[in-house]
Amino acid sequence: MLIYNADSVVFLFSLFLQFEINHLQDEHLESVDAYYNKKSYGLQAIQFKTNFRTSELMGYSYECTMFTLAVKGKKIIGFHGSDNVHIYSLGAYFTSITPTRLEVKGGMGGKKWEDGFDHDNVSKIQVLGGFEGILYIKVDYIKNGKLETGLIHGDSGGDGFLQKMEINQSKNEYLVYVEGYYDDASETIQGLHFQTNLNNPVMMGYKKGRKFLLASNGNKIIGFHGYADKSLNSLGAYFSRATPNKLECQGDCRGMSWDDGCNYDGVRKVFVDGIGNEIYTVRFEYDNGGKVEKTPYRRDVKNEKEFVLDYPNEFITSVEGTLAAPKSVNITWITSLTFKTSKKRSSPTFGSASSRKFVLEKNGSPLVGFHGYNSVGNTLNSLGAYYRPIPPTPDVEKLKAQGGVEELLGMMVFELDPLERITSVEGTYDDKIGGITMLRFKTNKKDSPYFGFGTLPSFVLHKDNHQIVGFHGKSSNMLHQLGVHVLPNGFKFVS
C-alpha cells in the first residue's frame, strides 16, 4: 500500500516505512524508482528522490524490473495506480516548479527589460564596459536543450571593451551568484562579478561603487531582468533549484544505502565509530538555518569518537579515507577517515590507514551533506558527499540612527543564546530631555524586557528578512540616537 500526503510518503511492505519531505525548506519530490516482480507483477520495492536527497530502498529489488516516474523540471504532487493484494501499477501527477525572483539591484533609470525564467541554464554572458560603467549586457540561454540567443540590453553602439563568459554545460556548470557594483552619481552599474558552482569566477568591469548581491542559497540562475538605456542601470535574476552537487560514493556501493541530503548550511560535529582497521559507521550534526539536526544512529556504537568544528566560522572542505584490500573476500570497506577544514585543521585519523586512498573534495567548496552504504554486518562500505559554493557576505547595510538632537539609572542585561539573532529594536524618544528613554529588543525567539521608562515606542529599527549585526549612534551622559547595521537572514560571517 502507498499512502501520500503533502508532507510524507508511506509504503507498506510487511512493515511500515515512511519518508518525510520538508516543504518548509523548499524540498519537493522529483522522481520515484519502482520495482515490480517479473512473475507476480506486483510492486515489490520503491525508492523516492527529492531535490535534496534519496530515501532508503523500501522493499526488495531481487528479480525485479525497475521503472522511473520523473519529468525534467517538474515535481510530483500526487499518485494514481491499481492494487489488490499488491500494488500492480503506479503513476504520478506533476506540476511545474515556480522559480524564485530577486528584484533588481541598482537604480530605476532606463527602460525595463525581461529575459524571462523559462530556461534550463545560462549559456554565455557578454558585457560591454566603458569608462562610465557597463554599457550593455547580453545573455544566451539553454532552453529545452537548445541554444537561445539573447537580446542586447543597453547601448550596443558605444565604445568600450567586450568581455565574455561561457558556462560549461558538459560539466553541469551553472551560475550561483552575481556580485555587482553600482555608482549612485551616474546611476550606472560599474562592474559585475559572476561565480559558478565550479568556483570559476569572472569579473567584468570595475569594482567601483556600492556593492550588491544576487544570490539564493542552493539555487542556480536561469534568467535575468533589469533596466537599461545608454548603460546598464540595474540587474535582477531568476533562480531555480539546482541539482545537488554530488560527489559519488567511494568504496563498495553495496549494502544498506543512507542519504543525509544536501539541504544544510554546514556541519557542526562528526561522529565516527570503529575499531582497528574497520570503520563501523559515521554520522553528523548539521546546521539547518540555525537549527541543529543530528542524524540518527545507523547501528549500535562501540567506540564512537567526535570531531567538533567552529561552525559557522569553519567548514569541512575535504575527507580523506582509505579502503581495505582483502585477498579472500570480494568486498571492501572503509578503514580510516580524516576530515579537513577551511581553517587548515585536520581531525584525528579515525581507524587505521591503508594504501588504497580516496579523497572527497571540490575546489575548496564546503561539504554540507553526506551519503553512503553500510554493510548488513558491521562496516561502513562507502562514503560520498554533497558540496555547495557559499555566496559572499554582502556589505553590511546601515539604517539611519533614530532619536533627537546631537547633544537611567543602573545596568540591565539581556542575554542571547548562540542560535538567537536580534530582528528589531523599539525605542521611545523624549523631546524635552533630548534623549532616548526606553529600548526593547526583539529576537527570533523572544522579546526583551522594557529598558528604561515607558512602553509605547516612538520609533522602530527593523528591516524585513534581515538580522541586526551591529549598532551605532550618538551619546553624552545619555543616549541621544541609535541606529543599526543589518544583514539578510541566513548569511553568516565566515573566516
UniProtKB/Swiss-Prot annotation:
Keywords: Lectin, Repeat. Residues 1-96, 99-241, 244-389, 403-488 form the Jacalin-type lectin domain. CDD domains: Jacalin. It comes from the Eukaryota. Coiled coil: none annotated. GO terms for molecular function: carbohydrate binding. Belongs to the jacalin lectin family. This is Jacalin-related lectin 43. It comes from Arabidopsis thaliana (Mouse-ear cress). The lineage of its organism: Eukaryota, Viridiplantae, Streptophyta, Embryophyta, Tracheophyta. The gene is JAL43.
